């Protein structure tokens, strides 16, 4: 139960988990729909007492004073637990009620189609008022007229017969009030059962419009758990790029992927497909929460915890996969120029520590939920965090320039808070480099002061206080101050400090490399090489390459196709296959250089190697791969193929974005066709 103190760290979420309020008796019946709730079965005694108490209260208050006492009650028909001899052929959607006053002691009258004469029930499916302890089998010899009461006829109003009344009662302070909205879609749902309860999952609301599902392009399934053969162990440095959105992480990762070969570096992009297409779109949920939800609500903090867990799930699994690929009993060594690189976009530090800290400071995440997320943080030896940052104005300009829908709610203040939270996490790690985990725990628990710790460890008090006051450790100390004697709280704090101290940080200011990506990579490379604490691990490079290839294929193919895009792509592939077949069967002579190219296409020949090549077609910023056999094409490719490439590139939008991001849009192994934003093609030697 929730605490009654003014600092309530664990408020129950009644809106989400439906926690009953036992001290408010009337609230148990506020939203009860008596027409759809099944009658209480005769074998339950705990649930009958509150219902009978309400019934007595309503009868005493005179809700139905004219109702004569009855000797018998109609047999109950429990839709959830039907008797064995019932035929499951009730027509529940035909609800005919009498026009007289509503009573809790009299259930609604349902017309049954079991028999021609009327109702049919087993002898144990009824109860006699005032004699609940009598064995029901003793009334088996009663006639049907003595056993059942006579049902009065319905109203003679034709409109009532065509449209039977469907009342929905609810108890509020001893009175009955109608809630017609409860049954707005109930008859349609009952009618969808087709008078059968055997398949309740086929019910559908005919009044509601079904949501349109956009078809998505599902990438080919490449299992990363398959046997990849003999492992290939090499020394590799594992680096995780972190920082605010649009700080330059993905740009630097793509530069490393394009510049370095697969034998030198492997890159793993953000798991964007898992965040946007698997089960739910967590980016859209975050936007909705920031627009609609208010700080301080328990439902808001519950939704944010769900979102942060989804952000953290793929990041944790990637880190665990890399840890499993480390060779057992291998020692870490300092990084060298000939070592390999494993570069990952995002670490679980951002999903479980940094962004929850931002949300908690904004009042949207409770202290309890922030502390629970903090306890899930995990790091491994050898992991390096490359913290990248730019100034706020440059970061905001980049963010608005790329124009993502999920980032429209981000303003300058939000960017400042994210940068401050990353700086706070870095300062917490830096504090652990000066002080031991035990000393940090004593300061957070209030068992020791910062002055005593500085005197014991021999650290300058000015430096230590400046790092300590950077809000991360101060905030954590304030959160656990009232519960510092709890052993679970102590274990969570100790585990967080030990995991955080395992990491290694390098900070890169990209403000000086605005249009110089190679310079930014050089700055990152030199900082890693000069840091003697950064170590390499002996890792299975074959398994990591399989993970990287799968991650890139999933990242590049996660796109929703429209009908025009699918049609244009199919038309282009058919044209390409036809022209390629013509070139194979009847090779055309080379065109003269004086031939005027159509649509701005150059007529320079394209030399294709005799081996197979991969044609990469860009669809709105992503790649779609098609393998074409070029064995028989020796010297020239017909001009129509180049024109088809040019025409296909203009079918889709964001060509300028694609060109700036990937540069080489279409390529044949070692020679490529570059499509620029002015609408012309040129052959480029790679």
UniProtKB/Swiss-Prot annotation:
Q: Which reaction does it catalyse?
A: thymidine + ATP = dTMP + ADP + H(+)
EC number(s) given by UniProt: 2.7.1.21
What organism does the UniProt record list as the source? Alcelaphine herpesvirus 1 (strain WC11) (AlHV-1)
Matching InterPro entries? Herpes_TK (IPR001889), Herpes_TK_C (IPR013672), P-loop_NTPase (IPR027417)
Residues annotated as catalytic? 270 (proton acceptor)
Q: Which family does it belong to?
A: Belongs to the herpesviridae thymidine kinase family.
Q: What is this protein called?
A: Thymidine kinase
Per the UniProt entry, what is one GO biological process? TMP biosynthetic process
Q: Which UniProt keywords apply?
A: ATP-binding, DNA synthesis, Early protein, Kinase, Nucleotide-binding, Transferase
**Quick one: which residues bind substrate?**
308, 404
Residue ranges annotated as compositionally biased, kind Polar residues, are 1-14
Task: Please describe the quaternary structure of this protein.
Answer: Homodimer.
Residues annotated as binding ATP are: 243-250, 398
Gene this protein is translated from: TK
* Pfam families, per the entry: Herpes_glycop_H, Herpes_TK, Herpes_TK_C
List, in alphabetical order, the Gene Ontology terms for molecular function in this entry.
Answer: ATP binding; thymidine kinase activity
Q: Where is this region: Disordered?
A: 1-21, 64-85
- Tell me, in a sentence or two, what this protein's role is: Catalyzes the transfer of the gamma-phospho group of ATP to thymidine to generate dTMP in the salvage pathway of pyrimidine synthesis. The dTMP serves as a substrate for DNA polymerase during viral DNA replication. Allows the virus to be reactivated and to grow in non-proliferative cells lacking a high concentration of phosphorylated nucleic acid precursors.
* Record keyword Amino-acid biosynthesis present: no
């Amino acid at each position: 139960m929730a605490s009654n103190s003014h600092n309530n760290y664990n408020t129950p979420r009644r809106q989400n988990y439906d926690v009953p309020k036992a001290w408010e008796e009337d609230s148990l019946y506020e939203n009860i729909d008596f027409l759809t709730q099944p009658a209480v079965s005769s074998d339950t005694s705990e649930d009958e007492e509150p219902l009978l108490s309400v019934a007595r209260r309503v009868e005493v208050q005179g809700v139905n004073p004219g109702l004569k006492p009855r000797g018998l009650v109609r047999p109950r028909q429990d839709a959830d637990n039907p008797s064995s001899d019932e035929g499951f052929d009730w027509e529940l959607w035909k609800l005919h009620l009498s026009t007289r006053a509503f009573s809790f002691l009299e259930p609604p009258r349902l017309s049954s189609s079991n028999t021609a004469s009327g109702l049919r029930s087993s002898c144990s499916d009824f109860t006699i008022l005032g004699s609940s302890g009598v064995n029901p089998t003793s009334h088996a010899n009663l006639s049907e007229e003595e056993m059942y009461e006579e049902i009065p006829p319905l109203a003679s109003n034709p409109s009532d017969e065509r449209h039977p009344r469907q009342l929905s009662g609810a108890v509020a302070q001893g009175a009955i009030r109608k809630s017609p909205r409860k049954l707005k879609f109930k008859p349609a749902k009952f009618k969808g059962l087709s008078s059968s309860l055997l398949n309740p999952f086929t019910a559908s609301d005919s009044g509601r419009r079904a949501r349109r599902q956009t078809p998505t392009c599902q990438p080919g399934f490449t299992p990363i758990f398959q046997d990849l053969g003999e492992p290939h162990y090499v020394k590799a440095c594992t680096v995780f790029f972190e920082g605010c959105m649009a700080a330059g992480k993905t740009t630097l990762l793509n530069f490393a992927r394009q510049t370095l070969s697969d034998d030198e570096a492997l890159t793993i992009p953000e798991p964007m497909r898992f965040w946007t297409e698997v089960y739910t779109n967590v980016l859209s949920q975050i936007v909705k929460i920031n627009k609609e939800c208010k700080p301080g609500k328990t439902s808001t903090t519950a939704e944010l915890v769900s979102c942060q867990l989804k952000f953290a799930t793929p990041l944790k699994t990637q880190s665990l996969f890399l840890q499993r690929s480390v060779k057992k009993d291998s020692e870490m060594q300092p990084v060298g120029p000939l070592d390999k690189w494993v570069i990952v976009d995002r670490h679980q530090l951002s999903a479980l520590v940094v962004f929850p800290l931002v949300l908690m400071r904004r009042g949207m995440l409770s202290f309890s939920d922030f502390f629970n997320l903090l306890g899930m943080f995990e790091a491994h030896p050898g992991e390096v965090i490359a913290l990248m940052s730019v100034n706020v104005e440059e970061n905001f300009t980049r963010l608005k320039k790329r124009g993502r829908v999920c980032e429209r709610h981000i303003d300058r203040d939000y960017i400042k808070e994210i940068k401050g939270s990353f700086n706070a996490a870095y300062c917490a790690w830096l504090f652990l480099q000066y002080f031991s985990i035990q000393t940090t725990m004593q300061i957070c628990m209030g068992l020791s002061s910062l002055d005593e710790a500085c005197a014991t460890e021999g650290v300058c008090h000015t430096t230590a206080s400046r790092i300590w006051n950077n809000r991360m450790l101060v905030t954590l100390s304030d959160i656990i101050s009232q519960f510092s004697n709890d052993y679970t709280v102590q274990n969570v704090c100790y585990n967080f400090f030990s995991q955080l101290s395992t990491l290694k940080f390098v900070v890169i200011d990209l403000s000086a490399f605005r249009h110089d990506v190679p310079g930014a990579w050089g700055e990152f490379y030199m900082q890693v090489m000069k840091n003697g604490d950064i170590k390499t691990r002996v890792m299975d490079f074959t398994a990591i390459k399989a993970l990287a290839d799968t991650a890139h294929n999933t990242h590049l193919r996660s796109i929703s196709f429209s009908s025009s895009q699918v049609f244009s792509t199919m038309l282009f592939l058919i044209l390409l296959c036809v022209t390629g077949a013509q070139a194979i069967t009847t090779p055309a002579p080379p065109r003269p250089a004086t031939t005027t190219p159509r649509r701005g296409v150059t007529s320079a020949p394209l030399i294709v190697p005799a081996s197979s090549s991969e044609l990469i077609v860009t669809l709105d910023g992503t790649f779609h791969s098609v393998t074409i056999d070029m064995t028989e094409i020796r010297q020239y490719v017909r001009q129509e193929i180049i024109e088809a490439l040019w025409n296909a590139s203009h079918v889709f939008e964001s060509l300028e974005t694609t060109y700036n991001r990937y540069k080489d849009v279409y390529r044949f192994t070692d020679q490529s066709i570059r499509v620029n934003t002015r609408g012309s093609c040129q052959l480029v030697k790679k």
